[in-house]
């Protein structure tokens, strides 16, 4: 089964339709339609890679504004990155940026209910920023692969590691069960090989 997976990866770019949870294919295809050459895709690639730079810079600005407790600027930055990510069809990134925009406007994540406490809004923005970065890394890897760049799955940014560590902390009871299952599986092949 593994060799088939390897062949898929080598046969060309990933199928965008397999990643609907993070990328709106029809929106992204509108960007692709602007390419003069479907094989090179230089124009769309420049737009996408420009977004990568823009997102990285905006993440840094958001972190600075969190530290400065500047909700108005955080709302503006969330709005800015929401628009850029929506243009490319980056579903989860857009949704997260909209939440940052709402929290920065002293609202809840939906933007419908007022949230007067600045510290609550700042904490929500920080948590949402961490989530957005994780979703951004997923779609960044997908698009870099789409444009023919080799991307290692092991490459993780610090925020991805933090989210995975938080998930591990939430599920500590499952680990002993897995170990017990692994020990049992290890013993079973020995018994069947006799």
Where are the regions a protein language model picked out?
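Two-component system phosphorelay core
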Residues: 1-76, 86-194
């Amino acid at each position: 089964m593994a060799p088939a997976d390897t062949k898929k990866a080598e046969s060309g770019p990933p199928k965008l339709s397999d990643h609907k949870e993070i990328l709106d294919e029809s929106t992204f295809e509108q960007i692709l339609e602007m390419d003069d050459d479907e094989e090179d895709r230089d124009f769309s690639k420049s737009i996408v890679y420009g977004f990568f730079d823009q997102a990285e810079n905006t993440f840094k600005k958001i972190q600075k504004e969190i530290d400065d407790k500047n909700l108005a600027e955080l709302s503006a930055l969330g709005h800015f990155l929401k628009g850029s990510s929506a243009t490319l069809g980056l579903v989860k990134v857009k949704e997260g940026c909209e939440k940052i925009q709402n929290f920065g406007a002293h609202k809840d994540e939906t933007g419908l209910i007022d949230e007067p406490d600045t510290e609550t809004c700042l904490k929500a923005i920080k948590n949402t920023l961490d989530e957005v970065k994780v979703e951004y890394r997923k779609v960044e890897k997908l698009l870099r692969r789409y444009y023919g760049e080799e991307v290692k799955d092991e490459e993780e940014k610090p925020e991805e590691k933090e989210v995975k560590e938080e998930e591990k902390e939430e599920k500590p009871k499952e680990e002993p069960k897995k170990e017990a299952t692994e020990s049992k599986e290890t013993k079973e092949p020995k018994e069947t090989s006799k």
